[in-house]
Amino acid sequence: MDFAPSARAQALRERMDAFVERYLLPHNPAWHRAVQEGAYPPPFMEDLKALAREEGLWNLFLPGLRDDEPGTRLSHLEYAPLAESMGRLPWAAEVFNCSAPDTGNMELLHRFASPAQRQQWLEPLLQGHIRSAFAMSEPDVASSDPTNLQTTVRREGDTLVVQGRKWFITGAAHPHCRLLIVLCRSADDEGSGEPMPDSHHQHSMVLVPLDAPGVQVLRNSSVPHQHTP
């Protein structure tokens, strides 16, 4: 396999490096001051995002974009050097709409969302109008093994009811966060007459609006050397 960057990827890398040098590095001290003072995201972030989009440095991570969706449609191999360039600053990826957990969430929605879900969630995420979070970790279990998860989902008529507690959910306290993708286990529906699947086939990812009834963000946990929510 040829790992040499394509001409297109090389040109984008040069534009990315120039953008980081010209716009992001000069803002780095102000970014750190702002987040240490609790002013996250700093007010200049939206201006930088608009500049990045004008430069064609937007949604660089998703190769399967449709023609009407904003982005570059790079392969993963082409994206790799751009990710390296963004890695010069811990906050740079957000400027290019390439920050986690939104990248993974957008890929999930791009592959599996219904047309209504695409319109409600994927389109504003691709535009950078909202942020999202992926809720997996839980306080009382070793959550890296999904079979340990205690959060459940059950169906009541046309409604899905999610019950549980999550923590260390990157982005959940971001002021622009509007969507949680919550990893749950199927609740045991005693009245259904259906046998429960085994522990490795009980999981679902549920789209939960942050303003849905019953959703509470109780606190923003502090993490060493990380000030973003």
Segments and roles (model prediction):
Residues 142-163:
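Cytochrome P450 C-terminal beta-domain/meander region
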Residues 128-137:
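A short, Trp-centered hydrophobic/proline-enriched beta-strand micro-motif
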Residues 49-119, 123-128, 171-179:
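Internal helix-loop-helix
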Residues 9, 20, 56, 82, ...:
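Buried hydrophobic positions in well-ordered alpha/beta secondary-structure cores of metabolic enzymes
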Residues 26-51:
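Short secondary-structure junction/hinge motifs that connect adjacent elements
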Residues 148, 154, 211-229:
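Flexible, small-/acidic-enriched active-site or ligand-binding loops
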Residues 1-14:
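Intrinsic disorder at enzyme termini
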Residues 159, 163-218:
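A short core secondary-structure module
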